[in-house]
Amino acid sequence: MSNISLYCLPYSGGSAAMFYKWRSVLSDNITLRPLEPAGRGTRIRQPLCLTMVDAVAALYHPFVKHYTGGDYAIFGHSLGGIMAFELVHYILDHGHDMPCALFFSGCRPPDRASHEVILHTLPDQAFMEEIVKLGGTPVDVFRNKELMTIFTPIIKNDYRLYEQYVFQAKARTLTCPIVLFHGDADNLVMQDELLAWEKFTTRKTRTIIFPAADHFFVDKHFEQVVGYVNQTIESLEIVG
């Protein structure tokens, strides 16, 4: 089997660093390439993007910097899943090949992104209290005042991206398999919503459920998540 690049996108407030531990578990033929959203981590000096369109364009630049052709897959968790969906269409619009697989984790289908509750306009303290209740951001961030000072603007902006996101129908249907990861104790994404992902690809959609797992199963059960990524890529009909 040929080598495959795996591009990964983090959840709200997250950075590319959350994926570094994956390297010890990924198969040898998979090269990990975490994508850093602007305004955090290795791109902390860059301004935050205020729209999903700008955020995706900013993610394309590090993608194309490393992509030299060949097989690739994309993984995104939560907000990162919506970004991954938009990014793959942006990549295709710029003349690159279809990915060999897409992994959407803890993520509603793009046409079902929820705008029922708007949080990013709340004062900081009220905002933080609400997202802790929702389970939409790791609680550890809010136990450290220094981290809060750094990450609150980032997290609020990520919520802005999601809450102002409006799905636009695409010119194409994807032709790669989609794998969905879901924690059955996730109170942000309901399992029955995941069926709507099927219409976005002509290929098979597989759903993997993590029992008694909340929205952050991607951290707590990362070895299992990576195991399924390895298994999926191993099963693809790719000739080296």
Regions found by a protein language model. Name each.
Residues 2-72, 110, 116-128, 210, ...:
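Active-site catalytic motif of lipid deacylating hydrolases and related acyltransferases
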Residues 76-80, 84:
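Gly/Ala-rich beta-loop-alpha elbow adjacent to hydrolase catalytic centers
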Residues 89-127, 163:
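Flexible "cap/lid" loop of the alpha/beta hydrolase fold
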Residues 153-171:
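Active-site nucleophile elbow and catalytic-triad environment of alpha/beta-hydrolase enzymes
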Residues 180-182:
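Short beta-strand/loop motif that positions the catalytic acidic residue
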Residues 185-189, 215-216:
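Acidic catalytic loop of the alpha/beta-hydrolase fold
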Residues 190-199:
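Short alpha-helix in the alpha/beta-hydrolase fold that links the catalytic acid
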Residues 213-222:
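Catalytic histidine-centered segment of alpha/beta-hydrolase-like enzymes
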